[in-house]
Amino acid sequence: EVGEEITQTIADWEGRIIVAAVASNLSRIQQVFDAAADTGRRVVLTGFDVENIVRTAIRLKKLSLANESLLIKPKEMSRFEDHELIILETGRMGEPINGLRKMSIGRHRYVEIKDGDLVYIVTTPSIAKEAVMARVENMIYQAGGVVKLITQSLRVSGHGNARDLQLMIN
């Protein structure tokens, strides 16, 4: 299951983790929150969009936190060791690729990718952005980070397969 893989990946990494997700995928965000609670890490929300989405989802009981101290503000990161942090990057309009690019070249508002960081991509980039994603992955490696993609068998594209399309046509 996806949640188990996320928790295991986070538990196994000794340094700082940057999780790239789509802001509107609340089930994936919940899995990150659960993994953080299970592994004793705090979650930093780096974007205005994701912060608003998360706060609203918590208020509407669509997301839950194991405890209120699970979420910290970006300015509080310096109070924690790298192994205590998960940085949740969703980028503007819920797309994390540009935020990761900025992190890899030191232009992000709060985070710069450094040696020992794991960039864990738990979303499937749209087909139109695959080339951009490949370039960003290279930039992350050049900055000293390590990239891990969620297991292919666990990813969901949001698009129908050939059988689904055939069913719709007939």
PLM region spans:
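Acidic/His-rich, metal-assisted hydrolase cores and their charged scaffolds
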Residues: 1-170
